């Protein structure tokens, strides 16, 4: 949902095309934002960017794009899958679930799913990356605590 509450972004897969779309809640008008295997779209707290995960070069990486469809930028360049991202309340940082560190043997032997692996925090432009978790199981779907709570 856009911070103004008037639009939302969602992914679509199907015969009409794959990608992200934006719908105006008041008019039901729909606009195609991206084309491709894009997923997990999230509006920035300031409303100026939409962050999403895109399948490119065999792995998922995090991208941002302006709501008008301009300014596409690749944020992560890992050799693993990056997804399940979340904005910090001020929009200055993101947290991402990633398999960039590889998989642990324990998951292979126990049939435990490890599609993403560990959590990483970074600036919203992809710099200053810090690993937050390191364990034998998957850590994923992070969420920030709301500001001031």
Identify the role of each PLM range.
Residues 3-4, 45-46, 89-90, 146:
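Residue-level detector of Asp-centered blade-edge/turn motifs that repeat once per structural unit
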Residues 11-20, 34-35, 53-63, 67, ...:
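A flexible loop/linker signature enriched in serine peptidases of the S9 family
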């Amino acid at each position: 949902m856009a911070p103004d509450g008037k639009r939302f972004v969602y992914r679509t897969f199907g015969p009409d095309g794959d990608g992200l779309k934006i719908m105006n809640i008041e008019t039901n008008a729909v606009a195609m934002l991206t084309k491709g295997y894009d997923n997990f779209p999230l509006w920035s707290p300031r409303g100026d960017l939409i962050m999403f995960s895109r399948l490119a070069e065999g792995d998922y990486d995090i991208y941002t794009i302006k709501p008008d469809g301009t300014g596409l930028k690749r944020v992560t360049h890992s050799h693993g899958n990056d997804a399940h991202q979340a904005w910090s309340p001020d929009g200055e940082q993101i947290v991402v679930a990633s398999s960039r560190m590889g998989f642990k043997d324990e998951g292979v032997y126990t049939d435990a799913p490890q599609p993403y692996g560990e959590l990483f925090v970074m600036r919203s432009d992809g710099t200053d990356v810090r690993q937050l978790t390191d364990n034998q199981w998957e850590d994923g779907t992070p969420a920030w605590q709301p500001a001031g709570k």
